[in-house]
Amino acid sequence: MDFFGVLTMLGGLALFLYGMETMGKGLEKLSGGRLERILEKLTSNPIKAVLLGAGVTAIIQSSSATTVMVVGFVNSGIMKLTQAVGIIMGANIGTTVTSWLLSLTGIESGNFFVQLLKPTSFSPVLALIGVCFIMFSKKEKKKDAGTIMIGFAILMTGMETMSGAVKPLANVPEFTGILTMFSNPVLGMIAGAVLTAIIQSSSASVGILQALCATGAVNFSTALPIIMGQNIGTCVTAMLSGIGASKNAKRAALVHLYFNIIGTVIFMIVFYTINAVVHFSFLDTAANAMGIAVIHSSFNIAATIMLLPFGSGLVKLACLTIPEEKKEAPAQNQEKDAFRLLDQRFLDTP
C-alpha cells in the first residue's frame, strides 16, 4: 500500500467515525430525552432491564453512551446499582446492531430488490432526503431526522472507502504476517482491546475489522480473539466517566468491566478447550462481514444469558473492589444530597 492508499484508508476511517458520531447525536436529539426517562422508570426486573438496555443502545448506536448514562443515573441516585446491571448487559447486545447493518454491504446478488438492501445502494438516497430535510424543513424533528440520514450515509461511505483502500493489503506479506500473529488468542485480544480503547467505540472497531475482511487475508482464527478484546476495550469510556463520580457510579463502571472480562475469559477457555479436541474448521476460512456480525452477537447474547443470574455477584465484586468508607457527618451528607441530582453526564444529551 502506497502513501495515497494509506491516506485513503485514514480518510475512510475519519468519515466512518464522523458518520457514526453524527448519526448517534441525531438519534439522541430526536429522542428528546425520552430514553433517559424510560431508563429512570426502570423496574427491578432484570430481563426488562436487559431488553431496555439493548433497545436504547440499538437506537443510539453506542453501548458506551448507554453505559455512561447509567453511570450518571447511579451517580445521581436515580438508579440503584442492581438495576444498572441488566442495562449494562443489554447494552452489549444492542451495540451489535451496527455490525449487522455494516454486514449488508457484503450482499452478493444480481437481483434488483436484493441490491436495494445494500446500504451502499440506499445511503445516497438517504443523504439526499436528509439534506432536503435540513435545508428546507422548519421543524426541528425533521432536521434531526435529516442529520441521522446524513450520518448513516457518511458512515457507509467511510466503510466502503476503507474496504476499497485495504484490499491491496492482501498481497503484502508483512500484513498477512501481522494478522497471523494476531491469531494467537492473547495477542488478538490485546490488539482488539487497545484499538477499541483508543477510538472508544466497539461498534467502530468491529466495523474496521469488517472492512479488513475485504482483503481476504483475515481468517476467523484471527478475527475471533480480536472481537473478544474489543468487548473489553469498550469499557474504557465508562471507566473514564466514573472519574470524580460517587462510589456507586464507579462500581457501575466496574460492573461493566467485570462483566466483559469474565464473559470473555470463560468464552475463550471453553471455546479453545473444545477446539483443541474437536477442531472448528470455520477458523481456517476467510472471515467476512456477516460472520463477524454473527460472532459479535452470539458472544454478547451468550455472555448475558450466562451471567445475568449472577448479576448480584458482579455487584458484590464491584463493592469489594471499592468498599464503603466510614459514614460521614449528617451535615456533609445533606450537602452532598442537595447536589447529587445535578450530573454533568446528562448535559450532553438534551
Give short role names for the model-derived ranges.
Residues M69-A91, S99-S121, M159, T196-G233, ...:
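Membrane-interfacial helix-loop connectors
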Residues I59-T66, V85-L101, P119-L126, L155, ...:
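Membrane-embedded alpha-helical segments of transport systems
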